[in-house]
Design a protein with these regions (language model features):
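N-terminal loops that bind phosphate or other acidic moieties
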Residues: 2-336
């Protein structure tokens, strides 16, 4: 999937040459919505989701025959700062749980009809502690970007993205603060269970890290403050865009992962929707900054791609109505 993408350097990553939404397909889908046996607009966001899918798949009546779910896992050097109550070994243990079908994401993908792949990214080699220096070198960042891009199935009709990594809610807060601004306290949350003192400590760590890397810009923010799973998510988003595959991002950590793409060029994320609004306090602020309205609000904060998998059911329902309902003319119903 990397053939049409330039991963020679972070500075070379550009939206130039990437496909745009098919306006004709959107118009055709909208016309079909107007002809279906219902009052105009009565299916609310389901109609908009059908048009979104039509525009990116390039057809007035898109289908989801193949849904791919990718969960990227990585470990973070900033855990040396004591920002998480769990040891980093949990990342590998959860990867094994995913692979054996025992996690929430396994059950939710089964219900939603998504093929799940878990990609572990050098778990034995955490990134650098970003309070002391950059989390990753440019070469490490580009390698993870490529891993993410190469994991995308070009025959998929939709892509779900999730993550696993002890400490990555702190990484997400740092990325959010660096790209969108504000104060660290408004970006950090409990993550996997930090208490009030732990949250305050996370805020201090994030403040220190973002100050240290204040000169980082564009995709350089990803190298300075991100992790391998965040870079892989960005790579997958870019590869999906090249293949016109719509993307459902999960919650706070996934959305923060792509914040450097938005900071580089907001158009990078035109083919992405956010599956759910996380309970993490920074997520609402981040979605507003990125111009994304989450599909669901379920008071979740698990990660793994769980909220994105739930949102896939909504997307399937939107297309079932869009493609399966009769038009007024077909049904012989007056008013069309």
């Amino acid at each position: 999937m990397t053939s049409s993408l330039n991963f020679d350097s972070l500075a070379a990553i550009s939206s130039a040459g990437l496909p745009a939404i098919d306006a004709k397909a959107v118009a055709a889908a909208r016309a079909r919505q107007g002809a279906l046996t219902k009052p105009p607009g009565s299916l609310g966001r389901l109609e908009a989701l059908a048009e979104f899918m039509a525009g990116w798949r390039g057809t007035a009546q898109p289908k989801i025959d193949k849904a791919q779910a990718l969960v990227f896992a990585g470990n973070h050097g900033v855990c040396a700062q004591g920002i998480n109550p769990f040891p980093q070994e949990v990342t590998a243990q959860m990867v094994a749980n995913f692979q054996h079908g025992g996690a929430a994401i396994n059950q939710l993908c089964a219900v939603a009809g998504a093929d799940l792949t878990v990609v572990a990214l050098d778990l034995e080699r955490p990134t650098g502690d970003f309070t002391q220096g950059p989390a990753m070198s440019e070469a490490e960042t580009l390698s993870a970007l490529r891993r993410g891009a190469e994991a995308v199935d070009p025959s998929a009709d939709v892509l779900i993205l999730g993550e696993m990594g002890i400490g990555n809610s702190t990484v997400a807060a740092a990325l959010g603060l660096a790209v969108c601004g504000g104060e660290a306290a408004s970006w950090v949350g409990a993550g996997t269970g930090a208490d009030a003192a732990g949250i305050a400590h996370k805020a201090d760590v994030v403040t220190k890290a973002v100050s240290l890397h204040r000169d980082a810009t564009g995709m350089g923010v990803l190298a300075a403050l991100g992790g391998r799973e965040q870079a892989a998510i960005c790579g997958a988003v870019l590869a999906a865009r090249a293949a016109r595959i719509p993307v459902i991002l999960d919650g706070f950590i996934c959305t923060a992962a792509v914040a450097p793409l938005h900071g580089t060029d907001p158009a990078f994320l035109d083919h992405c929707i956010v599956g759910h609004a996380s309970r993490e306090p920074g997520h609402t602020r981040l979605c507003e900054a990125l111009g994304k309205d989450p599909v669901l609000r379920m008071d979740m904060a698990l990660g793994e791609g769980s909220g994105a998998a739930l949102a896939l059911n909504i997307l399937r329902s939107a297309l079932a109505c869009h493609n399966g309902m009769a038009t007024f003319a077909e049904a012989g119903v007056a008013g069309g």
